[in-house]
Amino acid sequence: MKRRYFGTDGIRGQSNIYPMTPDLAMRVGIAAGTIFHRGSHRHRVVIGKDTRLSGYMLENAMVAGFTAAGVDAFVLGPIPTPAVAMLTRSLRADIGVMISASHNPYEDNGIKLFGPDGYKLSDDLEMKIEDLLEKDMTAHLAKSENIGRAKRVDGVHDRYIEHAKRTLPRDVTLQGLRIAIDCANGAAYKVAPAVLWELGAEVVTIGNEPNGTNINLNCGSTSPVALQKKVDEVRADIGIALDGDADRVIIVDETGTIIDGDQLMAVIAESWAENQSLRGNGIVATVMSNLGLERFLEDRGMALARTAVGDRHVVEHMRQHNFNVGGEQSGHIVLSDYGTTGDGLVAALQILAVVKRTGKPVSEVCRRFEPVPQLLRNVRISGGKPLEDNQVRKAIADAESELARNGRLVIRPSGTEPLIRVMAEGDDRGQIERIVGGLIDVISSVRNAA
């Protein structure tokens, strides 16, 4: 059945434009509250958000929806997505909500839902919520005496700070490291610098002055130029860039070079394999991860299991096949020993542990393999299904035939934006550029003709 609201990472869109309106947010609260209203106990939801201007509006709407369904709402305020997942379990909530559009600009917002186990909801549960959204939910409203209460929870930052600190091995401190961190003017602007400082690092922070409209604006993991400049300016040993909700991370080494999620997963996998804590004899990544990562792991007797794009697919495969390391090239890294979803800060701490134990510079620690030339370009679309056009299908088939065993081709619609993503990789950079350019031209011509 076709999804009407939920994409690869919850419901997302431009604020105050359907579906990201307060009306729909309230209805999601009623629908989710109804579905998770099981048993006779007092039900509760935890609701977090990032620092977007629209977060206050959507937070209040969701509180109204959940309380109308008879669910008590525990309001957390601005806090990272992984903290919401952790607190959903810690506070014994029936459901968790994160109001965020992750790395998107402030105009966008979104709703992510977590079950009582801290994992994102299954497709089946999301479809049940969608079905209710289309119906009259008057019958599901609580009786007057059973309306839920709303409460702002204090001390949630401290709980997450302690959780994150516990993921660094007890024999490791960060003393002697100068760390520059970019919090993307987002949800981790308070907690991330505090964790690093409490573990002993000298911390230089940027992107920690959110004003509602500057989240991810020329900062954070999708725009690391400011961090590169800061690393050079203060001569930092490492730079850490989080995104708006802090579920992804990108590293900048002491030379200013960007280290992506593929390299970070390689570092963690190799380190955990050496101390025999890696499960599944490999890691889980998506079809977008570089072929160089796959070759690196194979050379060391480890496997790379690939999934569709989206950390929920990575997590699902990890759970089914008992892996404890997974993630995406974009910097979503899931370490199931420590959490149920991507956690940029916790992933960065594992890298810092390797840096401290080896005594080597970040540029040496984090350059684990030579990436195969890879090119990713996007085509913006306004509707339709250009990938189903016969001309586009033929161009894709021709490109796959040309690459054969010397590379890979991935073409897919974005699950969060109106884009077609075209990615190719292979040992011949010129060939890759030509193939991607040709496909972009064909898709664009079909889009313009529609």
From Swiss-Prot:
Q: Per its UniProt record, what SUPFAM superfamilies does this chain match? A: Phosphoglucomutase, C-terminal domain, Phosphoglucomutase, first 3 domains
Q: Which residues form the active site?
A: S102
Q: Name one GO cellular component term.
A: cytosol
What family classification does the UniProt entry report for this protein?
Belongs to the phosphohexose mutase family.
Give the Gene Ontology MF terms in alphabetical order: magnesium ion binding; phosphoglucosamine mutase activity; phosphomannomutase activity
- Residues that coordinate or bind Mg(2+): S102, D243, D245, D247
Q: Which domain of life is it from?
A: Bacteria
EC no. given is: 5.4.2.10
Q: Which residues cross the membrane?
A: none
The record describes its post-translational modification as: Activated by phosphorylation.
Q: What does this protein do?
A: Catalyzes the conversion of glucosamine-6-phosphate to glucosamine-1-phosphate.
Instruction: Give the co-factor note.
Output: Binds 1 Mg(2+) ion per subunit.
Q: Which Pfam families match?
A: PGM_PMM_I (PF02878), PGM_PMM_II (PF02879), PGM_PMM_III (PF02880), PGM_PMM_IV (PF00408)
Give the EC class as a word.
isomerase
Q: Which UniProt keywords apply?
A: Isomerase, Magnesium, Metal-binding, Phosphoprotein
This protein is called Phosphoglucosamine mutase
Give the cofactors, semicolon-separated: Mg(2+)
